[in-house]
């Protein structure tokens, strides 16, 4: 149950993970279709993929509106396939596979509506709609408990909207400013196919490729492929599609091997290089999307351009034989960290400023606090305009902070480092819980107050051991600690799967 802002942000992050987990499988099926064939099926999969991107943006807008910071740049964000849907009941596995009846059956399981009376489920859900119902209930509860002015503190200018980003698919980008707009954003996601029970199979939008047609939800679009026939007005879930027939040719497909991994090609440098190029491009694209979700919404357009490059790379991979005489290579969708350029570094000048090299953005954030003074979230307030190389004040006396204005020369600043150089192992304290531990080093503390909330402090929460609710709060506290005082280390176990997916400061 979602009862705090920390819970809400945790579950919104899960929703972003969940939406993203469907994208690599959809793209593998889409890219495996040979050019010029299966036109209708290509349109279906492409439309669903585009809407999954929309759903990520809508969820991110809710997170931004409530003071959160969406994250896409951490290794666990890209699932290792085959995998169950993140935070689901794990009743089925999702594969990276070619376009086939089996892959479409898998997509139907992903998008299946729940029964109308299915309860909300914030974890271990059978359908995505149950999870979104829990998000809706959490938003309503927090709005009633805190009021919209306390709950919705984020800067709307940081959201991805029609004013910042061109969106050519069905549905709408919604700027979230209060409970009503947040619920509309969730409704957009649910009605496009990840919903509860559709007595009406149409989602209220026009088909993006055929504007004269009403659009059906994701589940029913994939059903059209299996049936080789479109739904039309008057059709129902029980009747099935009765509209125009179309050709589905399962043979006009690159025979990509299921669930490829880079480790399968360590003895083939040429293939490994292509896989690395694809994975670096994909990981870099996620980093651009993360930036667009954190105050630079216009950057999202760059990610669209990268998608075309990824399509070319994926199709090149799918033409390379694996060597078994039957299958070809395929994209592996594996996380790679950002390449650090030799030109990116911070120079500490003697008795002078910090000199930042490499066009590194300088961002100012402020703390959002609760009624008891506890820190709830970081809110981005400004990205400073700066050159590729810029100087930051180290003497503390600049009149143009955070930038250096030369004051250090006038006051004869002594820049001798006085920080302690003790080994971390000698100064840190380890708080041990069941399946999770936190390393605390108070010598780094800057008193940002993220290590306690209305319920408790991090030490008391750690003492609760296996309490899942306590672990959620501990993860949120350590993830937001700006100084590195509190670092979260997890020991994943079968009954502690949520923690293994959480981004942390460690």
Where in this protein do the model-derived segments appear?
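Short helix-coil boundary/hinge micro-motifs
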Residues: 339-360
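Ferredoxin-type iron-sulfur electron-transfer modules in oxidoreductases and energy-metabolism complexes
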Residues: 416-436, 453, 457-479
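Short, recurring structural edge motifs at helix starts
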Residues: 13, 341-345, 389-393, 438-443, ...
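Conserved small/polar residues in nucleotide/adenosyl-binding loops
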Residues: 489-496
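A cross-kingdom feature marking solvent-exposed beta-strand/loop segments within repeated
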Residues: 43-44, 372-387
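Iron-sulfur (Fe-S) cluster-binding segments and ferredoxin-like electron-carrier domains
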Residues: 408-415, 460, 488
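Non-heme di-metal
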Residues: 1-337
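Cysteine-centered iron-sulfur cluster-binding motifs in ferredoxin-type domains/subunits
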Residues: 392-402, 439-455, 468-484
